[in-house]
Design a protein with these regions (language model features):
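Extracytoplasmic gate region of multi-pass secondary transporters
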Residues: 25-26, 200-248
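Conserved MFS/SLC helix-loop-helix module at the cytosolic interface between two early adjacent transmembrane helices
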Residues: 56-92
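Helix-to-loop junctions at the C-terminal end of transmembrane segments
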Residues: 57-69, 250-263
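Cytoplasmic membrane-interface "Motif A"-like loop-to-helix N-cap segments
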Residues: 67-78, 259-273
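Cytoplasmic helix-loop-helix junction between adjacent transmembrane helices
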Residues: 100-138
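Helix-loop-helix hairpin linking two adjacent transmembrane segments in secondary transporters
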Residues: 134-178
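C-terminal transmembrane helical hairpin of 12-TM major facilitator-type secondary transporters
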Residues: 264-311
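A late C-terminal transmembrane helix in Major Facilitator Superfamily
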Residues: 318-352
């Protein structure tokens, strides 16, 4: 395997492995609820445990990655992921699962700063937007894997056994993955001072907060909502897999498209408007109209999922957002904060209303319009 290809594989896996647990909860949610003996809304607290911790750590993830360097940062990412999957297989009960997922928050906080730093170090400028789209598609590769393979593994080995199968690739990447990064150099001084976001980064963080709320709510409860409409475990896995396939296509194709636009904020706005339509279609599903579930899942994959990759590409290419690693860490604070807040909030109204996530998407649309004005303001011109 060539060095360029191996670099792209490691970047994709660095994004995929920590996020796989999120899509696993969406896919295996009905089995987990039955086995753990907890109410359905408690699934939301599983997601909050991992992404809440990730959001907190993301405040310092950028400076930490700059201090560690990309090689040590990758090693910490993959080893913490392997530790999380080990604990998930070994610890009993609901709170054991909460602890295991919390450990995975370390890897999730590191993923974007480490991969963005590695891209800045190893990828030529003309290829950066495409590589960002590719590595961000790793998140949807995990959705595809979770939907296509985990239901079958869970039927044979149980949901814990299915997730334990992920330990082997995590260990292999922990040993081999960091070698793709440059050799460690002398460490820079470590500063734990939380950087203040620029005006444009603050607005983009707010948009990503809204996107995180919506995506986490949608994926966490899609499985149990579909089960309530009479869908089988295999069909639910197909929903998540389809969501993942559409997300991969959207991230790979739309990120370079956004890079060619004068201002990607307009692309964000269009995608978010379409995402609100996809959520509305999902809400109309009944036991006799499963096609609406498919339309909603595929639509969310094509629209809302791509916005995070576009946002990361904006941060990496536009110096007005700040240095790559710290600004990516701050952007992750917003995104992961939304992931932490969304499931418990939606759990309170689950089964009664889908208007909460639709309203949050429309709020993100308004913020996208604000971002276009901020980037066009005098002294804040978009840098390409």
């Amino acid at each position: 395997m060539s060095n360029r290809l191996w670099l792209r594989v490691v970047l994709t896996c660095a994004m995929a492995l920590p996020m796989l647990i999120f899509y696993a909860v969406g896919t295996l949610g009905p089995l987990m609820v039955a086995d753990l003996g907890v109410p359905t809304p408690w699934l939301g607290w599983l997601i909050t445990s991992t992404f809440g911790f990730a959001a907190l750590l993301s405040l310092w993830a950028g400076p930490l990655v700059n201090w560690l360097g990309s090689r040590r940062g990758l090693a910490l990412l993959f080893w913490s992921t392997a530790c999380s999957y080990s604990l998930l297989a070994a610890l009993p009960g609901f709170f054991g699962v909460v602890l295991a997922l919390t450990v995975c928050g370390i890897a999730q906080a590191l993923a974007n700063p480490v991969t963005n730093l590695l891209i800045a170090e190893r990828v030529e400028p003309k290829f950066k937007a495409a590589v960002v789209g590719l590595k961000q598609s790793g998140v949807q590769v995990s959705a595809l894997f979770a939907g296509a393979l985990l239901p079958g593994l869970a039927l044979g080995f149980g949901w814990r056994g299915a997730l334990a199968c992920l330990l082997l690739p995590a260990l292999l990447l922990a040993v081999l993955g960091p070698r793709v990064a440059p050799a460690p150099s002398a460490r820079k001084p470590l500063s734990l001072r939380v950087a203040r976001p620029t005006a444009r980064l603050g607005v983009l963080m707010s948009i990503q907060l809204c996107v995180g709320v919506v995506l986490s709510s949608f994926v966490t409860f899609l499985g149990v909502f579909a089960a309530g409409q009479g869908m089988s475990t295999g069909a639910i896995g197909g929903l998540i897999a389809g969501f993942g396939v559409m997300g991969i296509a959207a991230r790979v194709l739309l990120t370079p498209l956004g890079a060619r636009m004068a201002d990607e904020s307009w692309l964000l706005l269009g995608l978010l408007l379409l995402a609100s339509v996809a959520l509305w279609l999902t809400a109309q599903a009944t036991p006799a109209r499963h096609w609406l579930l498919w339309a909603g899942a595929l639509g969310m994959g094509l629209t809302a999922v791509a916005t995070n990759a576009i946002a990361m590409s904006m941060v990496l290419r536009d110096p007005g957002f700040g240095a790559p690693a710290p600004s990516a860490g701050l952007l992750s604070v917003g995104f992961f904060g939304g992931f932490a807040l969304g499931p418990p909030l939606f759990g309170l109204v689950f089964g009664q209303s889908w208007w909460m996530p639709i309203g949050v998407v429309l709020l993100a649309c308004g913020l996208s319009l604000v971002l276009t004005r901020v980037r066009a303001a005098p002294g804040l011109q978009v840098v390409k």
